Each structure stands twice: as C-alpha cells, then as structure tokens.
Amino acid sequence: MARHPQLRLVKALLLLGLNPVSASLQDQHCESLSLASNISGLQCNASVDLIGTCWPRSPAGQLVVRPCPAFFYGVRYNTTNNGYRECLANGSWAARVNYSECQEILNEEKKSKVHYHVAVIINYLGHCISLVALLVAFVLFLRLRSIRCLRNIIHWNLISAFILRNATWFVVQLTMSPEVHQSNVGWCRLVTAAYNYFHVTNFFWMFGEGCYLHTAIVLTYSTDRLRKWMFICIGWGVPFPIIVAWAIGKLYYDNEKCWFGKRPGVYTDYIYQGPMILVLLINFIFLFNIVRILMTKLRASTTSETIQYRKAVKATLVLLPLLGITYMLFFVNPGEDEVSRVVFIYFNSFLESFQGFFVSVFYCFLNSEVRSAIRKRWHRWQDKHSIRARVARAMSIPTSPTRVSFHSIKQSTAV
C-alpha cells in the first residue's frame, strides 16, 4: 500500500464525495489565487485539503482563516462561519484543520422546525384554554339574569364574539390542508371569510365597550338612553359589509389559496384591517379621556355605579393593549437575528391564543357583580338543601316514638 500513495488519495477523495479530476482542478485554481500574493521568506504553499477548501500561500507562523465550505458530503453548511488552519514555523501546513465553527444548515432548519412545532402547541393549548374559559363565562352570563344590565350584555356579546372566533380558528386548523389551499375550493374561502368576520367583531365589540364607558363617564349621559340594538349594530352589523367588500376584492384581485395571505402589490386585506386599526386607535382616545375624568372628577365619588365604571375601565385598559399589541405585531419585522425571531414567534403565539382567556377573566371571573350573584345562588342552594334536610328530619321524628311505644305496649301485653 505504501507504493501507491496516489491511489490512497483517490480513494479518500471518492469516500469524501470528491472527484479526483475536480480535485486537481481545485489545486490549479488555488495556485492561481496565490500568484498575486507577494510573500518573502519561509512560507506554506497553496494547498487544497480533503474537504476542498483552498488554503492560499501564506507566511510561516500565521493562522489562516477561510470560509466554511458551502456544501460537503451531501450536507449544506453556513458559509458565514470560518475554518482555521495554521501555517507552521517550518513552512508546512498543520495536519489538523479547525472546522468546529462550521455548522450544518440542516441543524438550523431543524431548530426552526422545533420552534415552529412548539409555537403550534402553544397556539392549540391557548385556544383550548380560552375556549373553555369563554364557554364558562358565557353560561354564567346566560344563567345569572339578575345582573343583566346593558354593560354586562356588552361583555356577554364580546365573549360570544371570541367564542365564535376561537371555534372558527379550530375549523381553519383542522380543515385547511396544503391540498385544500391549492385547490381554493368555495367552502374554504367561506371558512376564511367567517374567521375574518369574527376577528373583526372582536375589535368592534371592544369598540362598543369603549363607547359605553366614554358615553357614561366623559359625556355624562345617562346610560338609560343607550339601547342594546345600537351596540348590536356596531358589534355584529358593521363588520358584515366590511367583510363582504373584502371578499369581493379577494374574488377579483387575489382569488387563490383560500384567501389566506396576500400577493405582493395586492392590498385587499387592508379593507378589513384598516377599520380594525381605526377602532383600535379611537378606543385608545376614549380610554385617555376616561382615565383623565376618573383621575379628576370621580376620584372622590364612592357610589356603586362609579366603582363599577372604574373596574370596567381597569379591565379595558388591560385588554385593549393585549388586543392591540398582538395585532400590531403583524406589522413588525422581527429581523434576521435568530433570537429575535424566536421571541417574536413565542410572544405572538401566546398573546394571540390566550386573548379569549384574558377577556373571560377580566370581564366575567373578576367581575364583582358576577361573583356576588354566584355567591347568592350558592347560599340560596345551601339554604334550600338545608331546609329539605330539616324537614326530612322533622317528618321522621314522630314515627320513632310511635314505634317504641307500640313495641313497649306489645311487650307489656305479653307479660
């Protein structure tokens, strides 16, 4: 074997996936790159290693830096990192080349897939928890008739809008396969339109919350003048023509992929996104005025109605940024940095999926009227069952002495 070193090199190159002919061409190319360099003294000659990296002619004692190979042995590598090789003091190259920084792009793709799958799990978990919490809140508002004022009816409708949005989200996730996207069938476009409609209703019912508080606190109108049908028109009615206009625009200008996403240069999605941003900004203005009034005029007031207004404002102050932040995140570019993209994906997935949970907590579970009504129901149920127990015991008391006396009489008769 020692007589055939060239044969060993050919076998090594073939094992590494390199053609011996191409290797000789690489040597010639590497030599040509080194011709322009003017180096005096002891030096290492231009050389191509077994991986195929060209190490140009370099002075002795220098650590030479070269980009990682773009492709080796069927695997792509990140060329932004470097490999290192030392030109020894005796004018020969070090046998070992440091490729420790060279990372497989395949690994980076695997990491991206892992983050994507985790984000999907967060989305499913958040929407499940939100849907359960929203359904519980819906049932509470349905059963507790004693608290049915206009303010709580608005809360109830907001919760209903979130339930329908979460439900259509699950329909989208379970039915929209890549094949369905490509086919662009009619039913999948209807599902997308329904999801976007309920998405818009979320914002318009939040707008209804802001309108109610602004009218009651800032404009100091009596809430008795406000009618339920006004808010139903705002929350359920106004979004409908907006989505119809969007659907017509999609049908004529972007009729593909079940109306999800958008083509470059086509702005039909702004037909419904624009009104959402507008009502969001108006709500911020409403809240600014409401907080200003509460901080000045109503600070000293301790009436129960004012306390309820304050609690409603606190809930809206928390929920509105949650709704707004998640929506505005779609317009933010997370950048090319991996950490930024991962934080963006997880943060957006969490807020997007847990919105319904936060709505049910702040507008129902922490609502003092709801909690008070539940306590009354619970005490009434306890009293009812305790009365039944007392009545049952009272009815059983007379029978016991009768049996005893009859038994004693029977015994005395027998004697």
UniProtKB/Swiss-Prot annotation:
A UniProt-annotated Pfam family: 7tm_2
SUPFAM superfamilies, per the entry: Family A G protein-coupled receptor-like, Hormone receptor domain
Disulfide topology: C30-C54, C44-C87, C68-C102, C188-C258
Location relative to the cell: Cell membrane; Endosome
Chain ranges on the Extracellular side, renumbered to this chain: 24-111, 175-189, 254-269, 332-338
PTM sites of type Phosphoserine: S301
Residues the record marks as carrying a glycan: N38, N78, N98
Membrane association type: Multi-pass membrane protein
CDD domains: 7tmB1_CRF-R1
Secretion signal span: 1-23
Post-translational modification as stated in the protein's UniProt record: C-terminal Ser or Thr residues may be phosphorylated. Phosphorylation at Ser-301 by PKA prevents maximal coupling to Gq-protein, and thereby negatively regulates downstream signaling.
Family note: Belongs to the G-protein coupled receptor 2 family.
Record remark on domains: The transmembrane domain is composed of seven transmembrane helices that are arranged in V-shape. Transmembrane helix 7 assumes a sharply kinked structure.
Name recorded for this polypeptide: Corticotropin-releasing factor receptor 1
